[in-house]
Amino acid sequence: MSTVTKLLLPLALAAAISACSKPADTAAPADTTAAAPAEAAAAQAAPEVAPIQVASGTYKLDPTHTDVLVQWTHMGFSNPSAHFGNVDGTLVYDAADVTKSSVEVTLPLSGLNAFTAKFDEHLRSADFFDAAKFPTATFKSTKVEAAGTNKLTVTGDLTVKGTTKPVTLDVTINGAGEHPMLKLPSVGFDATTTLKRSDFGVGAYAPAVSDEVKVRITTEASIPKAE
């Protein structure tokens, strides 16, 4: 065997071994396009929210479990809130034709609470609500419409400090049925809206204190026993 052959033989063997041990080309990624329709079908097959059945009748709001919370921005630093308690109101609900439903609510300003006595006094002063002259705020619906499953849109007249303006509430029905404690037909709602203080003559210190206020309402109401 020549010297050249002796030198090339180990190289040839190494090349052969390398070729045998080289892994097969990586398999092409699986086609995932078929999974997309399957996922979409699964999403469409998700159960829909069941409609809550609210009994027709005249409901009385429960002030213990009714809260009207308002929130604003203070000089860009904080988002304080206040709430109206001792709310009095009546809801007439027509299950056959929700557009025939109505609601009337009275908010006594004596129930206004910003969690600080001095601030409560300021809010009730002539700078804001002037509660001595205007002791209550009221809301009276003018239109009730279905807005999807367990959703309503309630439009009405809000009167604050002698000024009346139209307001629209986005309402969610939380639940309905016999109240486990009261044993009465009952219903619970949440509602939200956004107002401008200046529309009702309580726009003091705007815009440092935001003119817009967010309103969140939660309530329970029951049909009283017949007397």
Residue ranges and their predicted role:
Residues 1-18:
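Sec-dependent bacterial lipoprotein signal peptides
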Residues 20-227:
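Low-complexity, acidic/polar, glycine-enriched regions of mature
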